Amino acid sequence: CTPLETLVNSAETYQKAIAGFKRMDEVLSTAPDIQDKPGAVDLRVTTGAVEYRDVCFSYEDVELGEGGVDGRPVIDHMDLSIKPGQTIALVGPSGGGKSTTCSLLPRFYDVADGSISIDGQDVRDVTQQSLRRAIGLVQQDVYLFDGTIGENIAYGKPGATAGEIAEAARRANIDAFIESLPQGYDTIVGERGSRLSGGQKQRVAIARVFL
């Protein structure tokens, strides 16, 4: 390239970078809709009992959501009790409110009516940090970084020991698979976990939660 072409290309790159930075700054400067209430206390988990009581919710101001775009409730006076240690499955058609039900527990949204509690504590009365620290979330579309299996498991806890990583993998029932690999926990997973199957990626994500 000639010096003039280099200058033109640099100016174009600079403009794109500035535009991207402005968009990022707008996102970072946006105050979250969900805030801790005055006097919020830390969540104290004793047994892990979860209670949805007469819960209502609708996406009144959301253009694209899981149903309820026209203001009709996605969740309409729902009661649900989950006992400590109990495993449940929410089954239903697309747009039926399954993902929304899960999103209300860590307060990604607030209920319009009713209440959700953990061990008798309304989730709106506790700090978001303590609430979300107590909840593990594994989404359908798992994102893995182009690093080792061990690094991906320890993503949320960079200082984790090899023993802690191995224990998390054991609890996620993926330890036998990892140990069968020639490089074990040092195996590179590829971009977005391309070298692992969908189920294996899910279990790595579950191990993250346990860690």
Model-derived features with residue positions:
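Cytosolic ends of transmembrane helices, especially the final helix of ABC transmembrane type-1 domains
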Residues: C1-V27
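Signal-transduction coiled-coil helices of two-component systems
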Residues: Y14, A31-Q35
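Conserved E/DxxT/N motif and adjacent residues on the DHp alpha2 helix
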Residues: E26, D33, A154
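Two-component histidine kinase transmitter core
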Residues: T30-A31, Y109
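Extended non-transmembrane interhelical loops and adjacent amphipathic helices
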Residues: I18-S29, A49-R53, A166
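ABC-type nucleotide-binding domain
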Residues: D36, L43-L211
